Amino acid sequence: MKMKILTISVFSILLLSSMIFSNYKHVNRSVYINVNSIVNDSLTLITKDSVFNFLKKKNAIKDSMLTLDVDLNKIENELKNIDYLKMSNAFYGINSPVVIQISERSPVIEIKNENFYLDNEGIIISKSKINSPKVIAFFGNLDSLNNKKIARLGNTIMSDDFFKNHFNYVFSDSLEIYIKPKLYDYVIEFGLLDNIESKLTNYKLFYAAKSESNSIKEAEKINLKFTNQVIVQKK
């Protein structure tokens, strides 16, 4: 029995020593971080080089670091300051290289007066120096409280091939929202930013039924303000 207890004790000491030594080797291992540590090959608004240089400027990473000095939380927190990025995840990969996964926000509407975009959540995205996304444009003054609503309108338009190809831009007279089609002279009076999907669906059904008729060609304004109604005002 004593021999068995002694054997277990020796084994436990060896195991603990091995774990301590392994951990010591890990935290004192050099890791090399470069632009290839950043994972995302489909960026459109910012480059991996820009992200890498931003992290270096913020002292979140260096070209070579001890594992002990790598602060994964700091990397993720600094990346939150890049408004092009929606999510980041920093972790150790196989054999301990640092992996920095990032995902990009997707603009759905361009706010012309303010010179920025909104994504589908209503988050502000700065203009990019490397790309100009083709999204619906909005002209007019916008209350920041309506960012989510106008972003929802933009997202609904950009998610539908008919709306995306049919509408030219959105504008506001500070009271109501209007939409201008690409191929027609009339204006769509959208009204307030409510019942967005329902209003657009009503318009799509109306257009499908009337696109070949004179009522479309003779229209000056198409009113979507009222529930389940499409009212045509002729020239």
What is each PLM-predicted segment?
Residues 34-36, 89-91, 97-103, 117, ...:
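Soluble periplasmic/extracytoplasmic beta-strand elements of cell-envelope proteins
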Residues 40-83, 129-154, 159, 191, ...:
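Periplasmic/extracytosolic POTRA-like scaffold domains at the N-termini of outer-membrane
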Residues 80-96, 168-171:
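Short, well-structured beta-strand/strand-turn elements
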Residues 100-181, 187-188:
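Extracytoplasmic segments of membrane-associated envelope/inner-membrane machinery
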Residues 24-38:
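Ser/Thr/Pro/Gly-rich low-complexity linker/stalk segments immediately outside membranes or between
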Residues 86-87, 107-109, 125, 186-187, ...:
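Short beta-strands and strand-coil junctions in structured, solvent-facing domains, enriched
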Residues 194-235:
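Extracytoplasmic/luminal low-complexity segments enriched in Pro/Gly and acidic/polar residues
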Residues 6-23:
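Hydrophobic membrane-insertion alpha-helices, especially the h-region
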